[in-house]
């Protein structure tokens, strides 16, 4: 007869009518009993032939591809002018005095952050934007491109200008050296010497941002490089020849990277394997086409070979031969859905390219990407805005993967010890926290994103296109990309983006200037940064508590008035160092702090309501007697594991599920096991804060017997059969707790001390978790343990009782500056010693 739920509860000693603990508990360690119960509850994981269940409620397999939903109305979030001040350490020192070594070390880590992987794989530009939404290819392309453009404008990305130069917007840092041509400054106070102009290490001309100074020195010829003084002709033939040949090397065009749609008279340029168009070279060799600010350049080609000097820049609009978009203007429409109808809507489509306010030299950056991007909903609660997902997973894979640094995450007990108090709380929202931390420009070539331009993208998606054919000149090839879908999509997008459609249809390569989210280094750096900032705040306001986990910052103070003053002072400080807070999202929690999925109050910690609701839904949909795919079990265990510390039996109750996942077997829930788990999770108990105290109760065991020292009283007992030493020690600790009721117990066993009962026999682990819930353990060496003699059967000898203090730990939660203890009572209305009047100093 299968084991009923009531019988199972009694077996686990969860009912009150159980017999004496010393007799009942050792029975649960019996291997035979554990096997029989596992068999009865169907926990033996037989190899089932029934088909597995791959979906339980919302849970599907961990690696199953849930189809993301594309929202054509996604808004691109705005990024404020985020610029973390470079003198951050000095500003913190002005605020709080000298910083501790830990704080300085952490702040230096991110000023600037460095990232040097062992190996970087480069992918073709076609893989820049992932075809995540096959039904909305064009729409997704433009929305992603707009998102990238927004990030570049906000100073979060560099734009690759050539193999060795990049441009960006926003305020420069001191390590971002402005691009110098040899000894010449950007602003062109001195002339550009020919030597330095040619000395780019890759042999590609870099774009002079200010055209006029060079123009005065160089006559405009087909190359734009004939010096008035005849320096090039005078003994420098070899170098100018080298420059000319490099300019003509087809595979080496800089990142203006547009597949050319027209036949040039020069065959080499036409057949270039990468088919990048010549706008960059054209722009560099004819500086008259660069605007004086170096901001935008007209995308109108000047043919390299046959243009006489007089025609350069003479047409206001220039020739459109190299721009795929503008070529449609001069062609006959091929159908009602020809793109020329859209291109003819506007006379001025704006520039082909934009350039940043600042230009810097970079290490060699190929015209490739190292990761793909796509858009998803910002979060489950906000589907109106999009979020950019960057896939740099190449750095976490294979033999050359980067092993990311580890950092301490506060465990539940540490968090409760630290934050469970009667303070008033609020949470601060740091907007785009990752994008605060600057990256060294040397990391840029490893973190490249971008797109190959609309024509290539459309060609790749539409199977009929012959754009890769070398016959670029034929118009019917140009019109091969015309289709009803593309026409309708572009017409709708035209209402959103207007003339920017032209800019976005060109290829672009961007590198990260601030840390991206898709790299394992980023969470580590963010955690170091926010923990150092909180440490500074805690020392500046000693009677308050500031704590952070990643971008979640919380502040606590003894009264609401105190908290308001603290909030003003801290936000002013954070804004003064360049940390951008979203003040609209500040949450005032009162006395129950919501943090990291928990509710933390003076009574302890519980999981937040939405997690409890999820667990209820999970149990409602959990099938009985049906094999469930182990990947779905991973999802179920993830959810139940979060709330396990709040249940009677804790993690040990989930061990059968863990075992099936490890064995990659399907799991079958028996009605009894499901009822047992369900009951466990319907009644959640708070995890309380540990209190300091003196240890008065000690436990010890040998494989054959146990001994207790409770105050001056000594007790001993024997086991029916010898037990493994860890099991015996755990039983002794349980007896000590049940006999004395003490919540601080001394033991010399490290496994009991760790409070992880998952490696014990299953039934014993479940029962012990409930008996020892809320118990704190203190380590006492065997030689000093007063319970050592009784456990060996010697009651007559009494070792003196130790005075062993227990101090609750906050783990390795990066609290370098200990805050002074907070008095537990609320102050009187205006008590003379109120922290507002005495301890609190304005910044």
UniProtKB/Swiss-Prot annotation:
Q: Residue ranges of region Disordered? A: 228-316
Q: Which residues form the Reverse transcriptase domain?
A: 357-600
The UniProt keyword set, sorted, is: DNA replication, DNA-binding, DNA-directed DNA polymerase, Endonuclease, Host-virus interaction, Hydrolase, Inhibition of host innate immune response by virus, Inhibition of host RLR pathway by virus, Magnesium, Metal-binding, Multifunctional enzyme, Nuclease, Nucleotidyltransferase, RNA-directed DNA polymerase, Transferase, Viral immunoevasion
GO BP terms: namely: DNA replication; symbiont-mediated suppression of host innate immune response
Listed under catalytic activity are:
DNA(n) + a 2'-deoxyribonucleoside 5'-triphosphate = DNA(n+1) + diphosphate; Endonucleolytic cleavage to 5'-phosphomonoester
User: Where along the sequence does the record put site: Priming of reverse-transcription by covalently linking the first nucleotide of the (-)DNA?
Assistant: 63
The residues the entry assigns to the signal sequence are none
One Pfam annotation, family name?
Answer: DNA_pol_viral_C
Activity control mechanisms: Activated by host HSP70 and HSP40 in vitro to be able to bind the epsilon loop of the pgRNA. Because deletion of the RNase H region renders the protein partly chaperone-independent, the chaperones may be needed indirectly to relieve occlusion of the RNA-binding site by this domain. Inhibited by several reverse-transcriptase inhibitors: Lamivudine, Adefovir and Entecavir.
Q: Which InterPro entries match?
A: DNA/RNA_pol_sf (IPR043502), DNApol_viral_C (IPR001462), DNApol_viral_N (IPR000201), HBV_DPOL (IPR037531), Rev_trsase/Diguanyl_cyclase (IPR043128), RT_dom (IPR000477), Viral_Replic_Matur_Polypro (IPR051320)
Q: Which residues lie in Polar residues bias regions?
A: 262-276, 286-299, 307-316
Region: Terminal protein domain (TP), residue numbers: 1-177
Q: Which GO terms describe its molecular function?
A: DNA binding; DNA-directed DNA polymerase activity; metal ion binding; RNA-directed DNA polymerase activity; RNA-DNA hybrid ribonuclease activity
The record, for SUPFAM superfamilies, names: DNA/RNA polymerases (SSF56672)
UniProt lists the family membership as follows: Belongs to the hepadnaviridae P protein family.
Other information: Hepadnaviral virions contain probably just one P protein molecule per particle.
- How does the entry describe the domains? Terminal protein domain (TP) is hepadnavirus-specific. Spacer domain is highly variable and separates the TP and RT domains. Polymerase/reverse-transcriptase domain (RT) and ribonuclease H domain (RH) are similar to retrovirus reverse transcriptase/RNase H.
Question: What is the protein name given in its UniProt record?
Answer: Protein P
